[in-house]
Amino acid sequence: MAKFASIITLLFAALVVFAAFEAPTMVEAKLCERSSGTWSGVCGNNNACKNQCIRLEGAQHGSCNYVFPAHKCICYFPC
């Protein structure tokens, strides 16, 4: 019986140690996409689109996406 109790205690201690090392998860806000209001022409440079969305429009990020009939700069904002 004493051996069983020590095994249970050891398992509980291991569970506590593993739980202590688990990284907390962060919940990210959902992002909504919107065509850039400041971009003109066809979007061919993802980095330039991203920088323009962040700096000029206050978006989280941006990228060139195909929206019929051409690639457009799309900015991503919190919903």
UniProtKB/Swiss-Prot annotation:
- The reply to whether Disulfide bond figures as a keyword in the UniProt entry is yes
| Disulfide bond sites | 32-79, 43-64, 49-73, 53-75
Q: Which PANTHER family match?
A: DEFENSIN-LIKE PROTEIN 1, DEFENSIN-LIKE PROTEIN 13
Please list which residues make up the signal peptide.
1-29
Q: What is this protein called?
A: Defensin-like protein 3
Assigned GO CC terms: extracellular region
Tell me one Pfam family matched here.
Answer: Gamma-thionin
One biological process GO term for this chain?
killing of cells of another organism
Q: Entry's InterPro entries?
A: Defensin_plant, Scorpion_toxin-like, Scorpion_toxin-like_sf
- UniProt main location, coarse: secreted
State its role: Possesses antifungal activity sensitive to inorganic cations.
UniProt keywords, alphabetically? Antimicrobial, Disulfide bond, Fungicide, Plant defense, Secreted, Signal
Cellular compartments annotated: Secreted
